[in-house]
Amino acid sequence: MKGTIFAVALNHRSQLDVWQEAFQQSPYKAPPKTAVWFIKPRNTVIGCGEPIPFPQGEKVLSGATVALIVGKTATKVREEDAAEYIAGYALANDVSLPEESFYRPAIKAKCRDGFCPIGETVALSNVDNLTIYTEINGRPADHWNTFD
């Protein structure tokens, strides 16, 4: 992985549902109307199966996700040409400290060394109905579907 990972928070229904009540209160007063972006810089990336350097005394969250791997430089790409830039997909783990606000960039929560294990890039023809499972130390922890 050569560059920065750009990611979208709340990108499946279960994440949005957890925050629904908070989004009705100040300072939000409504759910986000556009994508909530965050980054994972290069220092966060480690290989699949490598140990995650957990900060001592901190609660850590883990969320499996699908990474779309852009294979060549892209600027102002037309929607109908976008597939030409996709090198493939990989499973990734969005490791982070708990977040308390979507108004502040999650730098301290998401950008720590080793906080983005990522698997091998594979070719997929359709990512619209994949079930993603998270296991922590061999035990089921979460699952969700890309359709959601």
Each model region followed by its residue ranges:
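Glycine-enriched loop-and-adjacent helix/strand subsegments that border the catalytic/binding cleft
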Residues: 2-148
